[in-house]
UniProtKB/Swiss-Prot annotation:
Keywords: Carbohydrate metabolism, Cleavage on pair of basic residues, Disulfide bond, Gamma-carboxyglutamic acid, Glucose metabolism, Hormone, Secreted, Signal, Toxin. GO terms for cellular component: extracellular region. Disulfide bonds join C31-C133, C46-C136, C58-C149, C135-C140. It comes from Conus imperialis (Imperial cone). Residues 64-111 form a propeptide. Expressed by the venom gland. This is Con-Ins Im1. It is found in: Secreted. GO terms for molecular function: hormone activity; toxin activity. Coiled coil: none annotated. Belongs to the insulin family. It holds the Pfam family Insulin. The lineage of its organism: Eukaryota, Metazoa, Spiralia, Lophotrochozoa, Mollusca. Heterodimer of A and B chains; disulfide-linked. GO terms for biological process: glucose metabolic process.
Length: 150
């Protein structure tokens, strides 16, 4: 069973390696608001495919990948203590107060606010880096993917 699972994995990795361009050492991609507004790179890896590919690369290299755990921590840290108190803490933060819920329904007319950039403090002149910037909005190399392994 392990051989039958390993063979398609190796074929997929070989195809990926042949597709990936070699990047110069030390090259860091930076994403600005303009980069994000232009959309994903034609050869970028985006969405749910990104953690899957990084996980596969890390497995092939014999390293671990904690991407899922990091995302889980971010989600749990977003639970507001006021929401826990409003619901008595009985649902573990899944329910929120009416005021908090209605705040998400306000109509926004500014496209920067609608995209979430203004709330996160992303400025037009300041860039940010990360796996989404490097591999979705830009084209990342195999070496850059390996850097996200443990």
């Amino acid at each position: 069973m392990a051989t039958s699972l390993l063979s398609p994995l190796l074929v997929a990795m070989l195809g990926f390696l042949l597709h990936v361009h070699v990047a110069r050492a030390g090259l860091e991609h930076t994403c600005t608001l303009e980069t994000r507004m232009q959309g994903a790179h034609p050869q970028g890896i985006c969405g749910s495919k990104l953690p899957d590919i990084v996980h596969t690369v890390c497995q092939v290299m014999g390293r671990g990948y904690a991407g899922g755990q990091r995302q889980l921590r971010k989600r749990t840290s977003m639970i507001d203590s006021d929401d826990m108190e409003a619901e008595g803490g009985s649902r573990g933060g899944f329910l929120m107060s009416k005021r908090r819920a209605l705040s998400y329904l306000q109509k926004e007319t500014n496209p920067l606010v609608m995209a979430g950039y203004e709330r996160r403090g992303i400025q037009k002149r300041h860039g940010e880096q990360g796996i989404t910037c490097e591999c979705c909005y830009n084209h990342c190399s195999f070496r850059e993917l390996v850097q996200y392994c443990n």
